[in-house]
């Protein structure tokens, strides 16, 4: 039984274990050798989760939300004469476009509907037509809807056409197995408060060493300079350039240990997958249909279409919160939806309790 005051059925921040919370009861010094050694262990563990070819990759930790780490990559990796192709079918792809435009980076957009995956044929067409494209960015799990994008195919095109590939794996890393060396991903970005099941406070970039070295002097921001952050961590045994979120780092280290204890990414994926499958089946029993086609659906978060006219999400939200659950509103404009997350310290009995509450009358029409 989860001991939280309510269960977060969200894509992060999410419900964490009691033991992850407990390690944050102590204070730590950013200059302490024990703390910086832990930072180095975290960096190494993340690379080992990402690939079996660990010598080719390194990890950079970056203060702030996951978006800070995405912007650090966009602002540091793409040179002044570079051009970025962004595959977008949701809010987080659009955010990358916004970053590029704010940073005055030339950007090309491959746009699909929010419930449809990235169109590989269109991506290749754009690469063939525009030889000036140097980088490709794609969101793995677009939590706007819960759709999974075909990063294997996107990365193959990146390799085929000689482009640097950037994968926003914010809501998938640690919950879906991938090997970034096999896929030839150059920069993968995620966050502490997603599938690793830590708390908010920093993001991280797992970067191909050869590509990261090319970023020296390219940063468009002092605090978000990816290369400078990495160089300091490398040369000073895990030290961050500016004040690091010490409590969050300790919680994340504990979360990594708990991921290992659970059986690794494959075991966690299986739990998330079973949660999501049960959720869709049980929600179907009470009249809710998922937005995304089953073959494109992630195990991370599920969008459900409003069941009828007059359905009031806010009333449902308030009632479920009274029962001890927090869910997410929808985030797309063309279809009325709401979202339920399957990740965090969430188990099948939690999913059953949620739907039982809705079946008993928490569904407000």
Swiss-Prot record:
Enzyme class: transferase
Residues bearing the modification N6-(pyridoxal phosphate)lysine: 194
Record key words, sorted: Aminotransferase, Pyridoxal phosphate, Pyruvate, Transferase
SUPFAM superfamilies linked to this entry: PLP-dependent transferases (SSF53383)
Required cofactor(s): pyridoxal 5'-phosphate
Record protein name field: 2-aminoethylphosphonate--pyruvate transaminase
EC number(s) stated in the UniProt entry for this protein: 2.6.1.37
GO annotation terms (biological process): organic phosphonate catabolic process
Disulfide bonds: none
Pfam family, one: Aminotran_5
Gene Ontology molecular function, alphabetical: 2-aminoethylphosphonate-pyruvate transaminase activity
Catalysis: reaction(s): (2-aminoethyl)phosphonate + pyruvate = phosphonoacetaldehyde + L-alanine
Keyword Transferase: yes
Species of provenance: Bacillus cereus (strain B4264)
Function field: Involved in phosphonate degradation.
Xref: NCBIfam families: PhnW-AepZ, PRK13479.1, transamin_PhnW
The organism's place on the tree of life at top rank: Bacteria
HAMAP family: PhnW_aminotrans_5
UniProt family annotation: Belongs to the class-V pyridoxal-phosphate-dependent aminotransferase family. PhnW subfamily.
InterPro entries the record matches: Aminotrans_V_dom (IPR000192), NH2EtPonate_pyrv_transaminase (IPR012703), PyrdxlP-dep_Trfase (IPR015424), PyrdxlP-dep_Trfase_major (IPR015421), PyrdxlP-dep_Trfase_small (IPR015422), SP_NH2Trfase/AEP_transaminase (IPR024169)
Quaternary organization: Homodimer.
């Amino acid at each position: 039984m989860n001991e939280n005051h309510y269960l977060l059925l969200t894509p992060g921040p999410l419900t964490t274990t009691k033991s992850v919370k407990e390690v944050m009861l102590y204070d730590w010094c950013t200059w302490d050798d024990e703390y910086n050694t832990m930072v180095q262990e975290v960096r190494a563990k993340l690379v080992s989760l990402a690939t079996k070819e660990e010598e080719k990759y390194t990890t950079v930790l970056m203060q702030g939300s996951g978006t800070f780490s995405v912007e650090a990559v966009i602002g540091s990796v793409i040179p002044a004469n570079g051009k970025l192709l962004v595959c977008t079918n949701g809010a987080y792809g659009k955010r990358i476009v916004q970053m590029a435009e704010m940073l005055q980076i030339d950007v090309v957009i491959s746009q699909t509907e929010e419930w449809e995956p990235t169109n590989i044929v269109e991506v290749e067409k754009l690469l063939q037509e525009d030889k000036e494209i140097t980088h490709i960015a794609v969101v793995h799990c677009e939590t706007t809807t819960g759709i999974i994008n075909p990063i294997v195919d996107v990365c193959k095109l990146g390799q085929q056409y000689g482009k640097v590939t950037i994968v926003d794996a914010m809501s998938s890393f640690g919950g879906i197995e991938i090997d970034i060396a096999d896929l030839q991903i150059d920069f993968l970005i995620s966050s502490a408060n997603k599938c690793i099941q830590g708390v908010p406070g920093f993001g991280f970039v797992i970067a191909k060493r050869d590509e990261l070295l090319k970023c020296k002097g390219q940063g468009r921001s002092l605090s978000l300079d990816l290369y400078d952050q990495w160089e300091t961590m490398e040369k000073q045994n895990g030290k961050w350039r500016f004040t690091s979120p010490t409590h969050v780092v300790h919680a994340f280290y504990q979360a990594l240990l708990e991921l290992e204890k659970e059986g690794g990414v494959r075991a966690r994926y299986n739990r998330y997958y079973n949660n999501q499958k049960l959720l869709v089946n049980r929600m179907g029993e009470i009249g809710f249909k998922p937005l995304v086609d089953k073959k494109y659906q992630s195990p991370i978060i599920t969008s459900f279409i409003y069941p009828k006219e007059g359905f009031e999400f806010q009333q449902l939200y308030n009632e479920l919160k009274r029962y001890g659950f927090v869910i997410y509103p929808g985030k797309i404009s063309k279809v009325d939806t709401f979202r339920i997350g399957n990740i965090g310290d969430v188990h099948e009995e939690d999913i059953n309790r949620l739907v039982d509450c809705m079946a008993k009358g928490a569904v407000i029409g």
